[in-house]
């Protein structure tokens, strides 16, 4: 299978601070020492991925919009929320919104609920592109900012998206080709794409 870099596969994460009315752009990237200690998380990892020390590993805990490594995703999200929202109070950060662009099953949704709770949310609201009552063509960023009108206690939102969806497409095709080869369906796959 074609090799993909962690930055090609990682989700783009946007953190909305309703209190300050600011949006922060991040990447689902982490760098860990092989001992398990996290060195850093987010977009600052991009430049470091190609010059990692021998005792470090860089990867994405959220791939194709799905949590692929729960423990690392939790540590990453905690660090990002701390970076942008400050230290959580005794009762946490308050109510948080998780907005996902990928279609998820119930187990995958539960992983995101748990991630936000573990990262410090007191309560979690889930939303995706199936939100009713949104005028067609409304930018998703406006929808997320507007959620504060519906959920008055929202303190922050986390949007999981992909700015370059072609990377996901290429990866999905390569994975399909690999599976077809494993299943003995290479000819059938070629017929589909020729």
Each language-model region and where it sits:
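Nucleotide/phosphate-binding catalytic cleft detector across ATP-hydrolyzing
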Residues: 1-25, 32-37, 45-194
